[in-house]
A protein has these predicted regions:
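Short amphipathic alpha-helical segments
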Residues: 1-7
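Intrinsically disordered, low-complexity basic tails/linkers immediately adjacent to helix-turn-helix/homeobox/MYB/SANT
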Residues: 25-34, 88-110
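Short, solvent-exposed alpha-helical "recognition" segments
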Residues: 10-15, 72-85
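Short, Lys/Arg-enriched anionic-surface-contact patches
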Residues: 12-18, 22-38
Length: 110
């Protein structure tokens, strides 16, 4: 645990607009007073928006300042595989929750 906290502290020094939080899929990095970095990634990478408009669109969609979105993007650039793993973990958790809900509905229907 001490090693994890030290690592997080060093990362926060390099990325001061971010903080670590506990969540249903484990520790994750998020903007201070903002969404998790993995949530922003979907609006920044890929999608139907031209690359030169993606930061501005994320600013609009999430109600953030440009420097916040750029801070999240900088963290993602440095720790891409970590954030991609969080995206995947959250996708899997959502699928499992949906499957459970469907099973509950089947049981209720008899």
């Amino acid at each position: 645990m001490a090693e994890e906290l030290l690592d997080e502290g060093l990362r926060i020094r390099r990325h001061p607009l971010l903080r670590f939080r506990d969540g249903p899929t484990g520790r994750r990095v998020a903007l201070v007073c903002g969404p998790d970095v993995w949530e922003l990634v979907g609006g920044l990478v890929g999608g139907d928006v031209a690359p030169d408009r993606r930061v501005e669109r994320a600013v609009e969609l999430f109600g953030l300042r440009r420097e916040q979105v750029e801070a999240a993007l900088a963290y993602y650039a440095e720790f891409t595989s970590e954030i991609d793993a969080q995206v995947e973990a959250n996708r899997q958790a959502a699928e499992e929750a949906e499957a459970l809900w469907h099973r509950q509905q089947e049981l209720l229907a008899g």
